[in-house]
Curated annotation (Swiss-Prot):
Domain of life: Bacteria
Keywords for the protein's UniProt record, in alphabetical order: Cytoplasm, Hydrolase, Protease, Serine protease
InterPro entries: ClpP, ClpP/crotonase-like_dom_sf, ClpP/TepA, ClpP_His_AS, ClpP_Ser_AS
Keyword Cytoplasm: yes
Lineage, highest ranks first: Bacteria, Pseudomonadati, Pseudomonadota, Gammaproteobacteria, Enterobacterales
UniProt protein name: ATP-dependent Clp protease proteolytic subunit
Family: Belongs to the peptidase S14 family.
């Protein structure tokens, strides 16, 4: 086992040990549930931290499980993320569009980069920011190295991905593609109210509806 692989699971173990548990009485006696499992029963999913493949697979599995439990009732996605890998984020995005239930999205803390993209991808009319949350949009990041031919191939692919994200952001925000291209050239920060005006979310929530 590699050092990085071992360190990763030490990190997971440490964080799991910090998750609160709740003891509930059942017909078979007391049973301890971690807080996230209890919230999942209420159809609440969290996108917390960097978006990468491991996390994305968990999010996808939870969304599909909740659809199988009830294909009509809304799913609630709470986002507090600095962004992350485009391919991981797109796997979550595609499942959000694929499943039958409406998906409400909520920005708590921050939704940056791919986090902002997923925030905007919720069901229209059901996308929210909490009052002191922040949103940041920008173009996909890429780091290229290797042979010149490979660099050219990857550069072309990055431009394709960038344009695809621009088109999808235009679709979900109602902005023109030209406005999206311009605004996403550099880091663009928005407050909760500014995110509503931009079309990334539909309203600011200070109290649960």
């Amino acid at each position: 086992m590699s050092y990085l692989y071992d360190s990763y699971f030490q990190y997971i173990h440490y964080n799991v040990s910090m998750i609160p548990t709740v003891v509930k009485q059942t017909s078979r006696g007391d049973r301890a549930y971690d807080i996230f499992s209890l919230l999942l029963k209420e159809r609440i999913i969290f996108v917390i931290g960097k978006i990468e493949n491991f996390m994305a697979n968990l999010i996808v599995a939870q969304i599909m499980f909740l659809e199988s439990e009830d294909p009509v009732k809304d799913i609630h996605l709470y986002i507090n993320s600095p962004g992350g890998e485009v391919t991981a984020g797109m796997s979550i995005y595609d499942i959000m569009q694929f499943v039958k239930p409406n998906i409400s999205t909520y920005c708590i803390g921050q939704a940056a980069s791919m986090g902002a993209f997923l925030l905007a991808a919720g069901t229209t009319g059901k996308r929210f920011c909490l009052p002191n949350s922040r949103v940041m949009i920008h173009q996909p990041l890429g780091s290229l190295h290797g042979q010149a031919t490979d660099i050219a191939i990857h550069a072309t692919e990055i431009l394709k991905v960038k344009e695809n994200i621009n088109k999808l952001m235009a679709k979900h925000t109602g902005k023109s593609i030209d406005v999206i291209r311009q605004d996403m050239e550099r880091d663009c920060f928005l407050s909760a109210d500014e995110s509503v005006k931009y079309g990334l979310v539909d309203s600011v929530l200070s109290k649960r509806i």
